[in-house]
């Protein structure tokens, strides 16, 4: 009698994911991870073990793009030692260069544009089967804005991200986003609500709503809905405890949305509102659609409606034709508003943008000097803001064990400040009262006042 050979399970294939850039890219990377895990891949944190490397890229600034090229260059040696390795490049650099990436990096197997993530599993299968290198840059997301059937993979985080729209119609003269992400496309509200409710059932207590300009959400849908109305529906129809959103454009920040910060208790008291420059002349060249005075009026109204709101922002120094007076106007706006935190960047030409062709470029040494001074001013403001928190009691959503010290938990206030505090038990996912006892440049130290009940 001949005994048939026992069938053995195929060896697992390992997937390494690396993300550059914004939270939208993080969301897309998680989506790709879920889709590939659903067809048998296993995630690994060790790139040397990977059978597939998925690289999600950013081209918003030249520095981010150069990081991508540097990383891809280092992968040549790894591919030489692991010839079966498949290297996938997705995101904004992929959308920007397309086939050019395959020509520049002969070890890259698959290029996936910003609207092709939903096809990642079938594309990778095609590359494996055909032994061909592929660039896939669809004009639109073929799957549309639908919750992935494998959304159960990778859930369980206390804070989850949910894309509500993609693309941008503003075409700021320095920004490549409309060229690589396309025009604004809003996701159906019912689908957003289903995903949020599902995430809440899997342990999420907070969601971050993502879009290049969430304030213009709903335009173009068969049944138009405003962003404030979407927020109200989230509060009524889901069980999520906290909601944040990013990014907002000042010109689209309506009175209705401002009043949501007072009227919706689940909406965190934090807003990221990029101003980019304090000079009206530079704002006009940037095609931002507002003046410095209009921006300040909206800040004043936000603080009138919600005195405890924390504000963060983006700013660019060294935009073409920026004079010393233009720059000083930016500093004056920062000192007047006193942002809780600020992300600042040196201007860099981006392909496809109008500003790349503008004359009167600011020398690099001037941009470096201006950025350093601005960052020093903001660092002092941020520290003073954090020191002012000392002695206050804040509701903190515990996100997990702190990396700062054993025996500590870490979480965030509604104002998006990080707090580390001693705790004898794991309170991940709980909302707890914490008194701030010390403040630092980028975080706070607190003490737990009481442990939560089952409903916290």
UniProtKB/Swiss-Prot annotation:
<feature type="domain" description="MTTase N-terminal">
    <location>
        <begin position="13"/>
        <end position="129"/>
    </location>
</feature>
<feature type="binding site">
    <location>
        <position position="172"/>
    </location>
    <ligand>
        <name>[4Fe-4S] cluster 2</name>
    </ligand>
</feature>
<keyword id="KW-0004">4Fe-4S</keyword>
<feature type="binding site">
    <location>
        <position position="22"/>
    </location>
    <ligand>
        <name>[4Fe-4S] cluster 1</name>
    </ligand>
</feature>
<dbReference type="InterPro" id="IPR006638">
    <property type="entry name" value="Elp3/MiaA/NifB-like_rSAM"/>
</dbReference>
<keyword id="KW-0819">tRNA processing</keyword>
<keyword id="KW-0949">S-adenosyl-L-methionine</keyword>
<dbReference type="InterPro" id="IPR007197">
    <property type="entry name" value="rSAM"/>
</dbReference>
<comment type="subunit">
    <text>Monomer.</text>
</comment>
<dbReference type="GO" id="GO:0046872">
    <property type="term" value="F:metal ion binding"/>
</dbReference>
<dbReference type="Pfam" id="PF04055">
    <property type="entry name" value="Radical_SAM"/>
</dbReference>
<feature type="binding site">
    <location>
        <position position="168"/>
    </location>
    <ligand>
        <name>[4Fe-4S] cluster 2</name>
    </ligand>
</feature>
<protein>
    <recommendedName>
        <fullName>tRNA-2-methylthio-N(6)-dimethylallyladenosine synthase</fullName>
        <ecNumber>2.8.4.3</ecNumber>
    </recommendedName>
</protein>
<dbReference type="Pfam" id="PF01938">
    <property type="entry name" value="TRAM"/>
</dbReference>
<feature type="domain" description="TRAM">
    <location>
        <begin position="387"/>
        <end position="450"/>
    </location>
</feature>
<comment type="function">
    <text>Catalyzes the methylthiolation of N6-(dimethylallyl)adenosine (i(6)A), leading to the formation of 2-methylthio-N6-(dimethylallyl)adenosine (ms(2)i(6)A) at position 37 in tRNAs that read codons beginning with uridine.</text>
</comment>
<dbReference type="InterPro" id="IPR002792">
    <property type="entry name" value="TRAM_dom"/>
</dbReference>
<feature type="binding site">
    <location>
        <position position="175"/>
    </location>
    <ligand>
        <name>[4Fe-4S] cluster 2</name>
    </ligand>
</feature>
<keyword id="KW-0411">Iron-sulfur</keyword>
<keyword id="KW-0963">Cytoplasm</keyword>
<dbReference type="InterPro" id="IPR013848">
    <property type="entry name" value="Methylthiotransferase_N"/>
</dbReference>
<keyword id="KW-0808">Transferase</keyword>
<dbReference type="InterPro" id="IPR006463">
    <property type="entry name" value="MiaB_methiolase"/>
</dbReference>
<dbReference type="InterPro" id="IPR005839">
    <property type="entry name" value="Methylthiotransferase"/>
</dbReference>
<dbReference type="GO" id="GO:0005829">
    <property type="term" value="C:cytosol"/>
</dbReference>
<feature type="binding site">
    <location>
        <position position="92"/>
    </location>
    <ligand>
        <name>[4Fe-4S] cluster 1</name>
    </ligand>
</feature>
<dbReference type="InterPro" id="IPR038135">
    <property type="entry name" value="Methylthiotransferase_N_sf"/>
</dbReference>
<feature type="binding site">
    <location>
        <position position="58"/>
    </location>
    <ligand>
        <name>[4Fe-4S] cluster 1</name>
    </ligand>
</feature>
<dbReference type="InterPro" id="IPR020612">
    <property type="entry name" value="Methylthiotransferase_CS"/>
</dbReference>
<feature type="domain" description="Radical SAM core">
    <location>
        <begin position="154"/>
        <end position="384"/>
    </location>
</feature>
<keyword id="KW-0408">Iron</keyword>
<dbReference type="GO" id="GO:0051539">
    <property type="term" value="F:4 iron, 4 sulfur cluster binding"/>
</dbReference>
<comment type="similarity">
    <text>Belongs to the methylthiotransferase family. MiaB subfamily.</text>
</comment>
<dbReference type="InterPro" id="IPR023404">
    <property type="entry name" value="rSAM_horseshoe"/>
</dbReference>
<dbReference type="Pfam" id="PF00919">
    <property type="entry name" value="UPF0004"/>
</dbReference>
<keyword id="KW-0479">Metal-binding</keyword>
<dbReference type="GO" id="GO:0035597">
    <property type="term" value="F:N6-isopentenyladenosine methylthiotransferase activity"/>
</dbReference>
């Amino acid at each position: 009698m001949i005994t048939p050979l026992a069938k053995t399970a195929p060896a697992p294939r390992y997937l390494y994911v690396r993300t550059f850039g914004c939270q939208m890219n993080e969301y897309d990377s998680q989506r790709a991870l879920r889709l590939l895990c659903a067809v048998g891949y296993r995630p690994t944190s060790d790139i040397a073990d990977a059978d597939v490397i998925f690289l999600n890229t950013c081209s918003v600034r030249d520095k981010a793009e150069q990081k991508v090229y540097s990383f891809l260059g280092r992968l040549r040696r790894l591919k030489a030692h692991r010839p079966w390795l498949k290297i996938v490049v997705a995101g904004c650099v992929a959308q920007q260069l397309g086939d050019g990436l395959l020509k520049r990096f002969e070890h890259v197997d698959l290029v996936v544009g910003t609207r092709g993530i939903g096809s990642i599993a079938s594309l990778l299968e095609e590359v494996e089967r055909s032994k061909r290198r592929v660039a896939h840059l669809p004009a639109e997301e073929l799957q549309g804005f639908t919750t992935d059937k494998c959304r159960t993979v990778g859930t369980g985080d206390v804070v989850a991200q949910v894309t509500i729209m993609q693309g941008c119609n503003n075409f700021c003269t320095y920004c490549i986003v409309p060229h690589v992400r396309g025009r604004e496309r809003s996701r159906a509200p019912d689908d957003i609500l289903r995903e949020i409710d599902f995430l809440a059932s899997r342990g999420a207590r907070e969601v971050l709503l993502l879009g290049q300009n969430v304030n213009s959400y709903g335009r173009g849908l068969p049944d138009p809905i405003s962003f404030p109305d979407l927020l109200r529906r989230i509060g009524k129809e889901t069980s999520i405890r906290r909601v944040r959103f990013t990014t907002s454009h000042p010109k689209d920040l309506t009175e209705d949305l401002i009043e949501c910060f007072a009227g919706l208790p689940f909406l965190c008291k934090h807003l990221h509102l990029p101003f980019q420059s304090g000079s009206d002349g530079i704002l006009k060249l940037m095609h931002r659609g507002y003046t410095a005075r209009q921006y300040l009026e909206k800040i004043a109204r936000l603080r009138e409606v919600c005195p405890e709101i924390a504000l963060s922002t983006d700013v660019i120094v060294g935009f073409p034709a920026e004079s010393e007076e233009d720059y000083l106007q930016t500093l004056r706006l920062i000192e007047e508003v006193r942002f809780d935190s600020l992300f600042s960047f040196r201007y860099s030409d981006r392909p496809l943008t109008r500003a790349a062709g503008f004359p009167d470029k600011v020398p690099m040494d001037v941009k470096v000097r201006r950025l350093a001074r601005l960052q020093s001013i903001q660092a002092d403001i941020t520290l003073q803001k954090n020191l002012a928190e000392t002695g206050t009691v804040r509701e903190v959503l515990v996100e997990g064990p702190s990396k700062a010290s054993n025996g500590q938990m870490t979480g965030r206030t509604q104002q998006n400040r990080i707090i580390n505090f001693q705790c004898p038990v794991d309170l991940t996912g709980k909302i707890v009262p914490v008194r701030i006892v010390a403040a630092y440049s980028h975080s706070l130290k607190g003490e737990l006042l009481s442990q939560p009940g089952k409903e916290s």
